[in-house]
């Protein structure tokens, strides 16, 4: 276990496990855990980008010192964190009492393993809206929890923070053209890589009978062949991006342009 300082940027630490061959041969990065001080987190998240980066990178988030604030404060904090990183589970902790199963072997950087643990990854957990430029493409995006939406069931109940760390989802029930997607992702990473904290997905590629597992940290992006599509399984793609003020429309429309 590597414990960093409270002001550390997790990005360079995570990248070391992929860029340094000697380290990669001997060590596997399992996950990034973020401990949040409920008493001071709101101010820290507002004042320090490093704190927001730590939320964006996290695979698991622990909320401590909840006994020092009221339930409304904790609820608002957890809502804010969820807006920044909806894929990371949050858990209140009492004097560091955490089950080891919530700390080790989370497989945050092994999406193939995550598919075994969570086979519903491709299924929509929120409603999706068609993209504005092509309503027939069946490509779309999901609202991150707490994100503004015109539907009456999504009226916000918490103060809205304009944090620079945000997440968005692309999904489609059309196959990607491999060459187009490779070119687009390569260009996107060159331009926006420093702002792309974590991204991952399961892809349906034209001409392949297997899922493609895709993930990355900043400019480091990789993919592996996953399991075959099961008979009768609905094929599709889902990509989750977490980053610093990423141009959502550029990503979504660009990905649509890579579909068959």
What do the PLM-derived regions correspond to, one by one?
Residues 1-102:
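Phosphate/Mg2+-binding loops and adjacent switch elements
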Residues 1-4, 172, 242:
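Short N-terminal micro-motifs specific to bacterial/archaeal maturation
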Residues 57-63, 68-230, 234-237, 244-260:
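C-terminal accessory "lid"/substrate-recognition subdomains
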């Amino acid at each position: 276990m590597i414990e960093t300082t409270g002001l550390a940027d997790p990005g360079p630490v995570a990248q070391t496990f992929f860029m340094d061959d000697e380290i990669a041969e001997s060590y596997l990065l399992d996950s990034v855990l973020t401990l949040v001080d409920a008493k001071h987190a709101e101010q820290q998240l507002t004042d320090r980008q490093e704190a927001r980066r730590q939320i964006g990178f996290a695979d698991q988030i622990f909320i401590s010192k909840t006994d020092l604030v009221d339930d409304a404060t904790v609820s608002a904090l957890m809502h804010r964190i969820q807006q920044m990183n909806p894929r990371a589970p949050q858990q209140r902790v009492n004097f560091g009492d955490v089950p080891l199963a919530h700390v080790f072997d989370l497989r945050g950087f092994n999406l193939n393993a995550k598919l075994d643990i969570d086979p519903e990854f491709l299924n929509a957990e929120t409603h999706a809206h068609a993209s504005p430029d092509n309503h027939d493409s069946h490509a779309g995006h999901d609202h991150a929890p707490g994100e503004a939406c015109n539907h009456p069931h999504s009226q916000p109940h918490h103060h809205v923070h304009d944090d620079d760390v945000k997440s968005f989802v692309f999904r489609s029930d059309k196959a990607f053209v491999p060459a187009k997607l490779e070119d687009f992702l390569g260009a996107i990473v060159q331009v926006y890589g420093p702002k792309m904290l974590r991204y991952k997905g399961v892809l349906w590629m034209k001409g392949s009978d297997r899922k493609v597992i895709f993930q990355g940290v900043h400019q480091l992006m990789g993919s592996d062949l996953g399991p075959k599509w099961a008979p009768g399984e609905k094929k599709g793609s889902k990509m989750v991006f977490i980053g610093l003020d990423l141009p959502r429309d550029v990503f979504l429309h660009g990905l649509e342009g890579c579909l068959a």
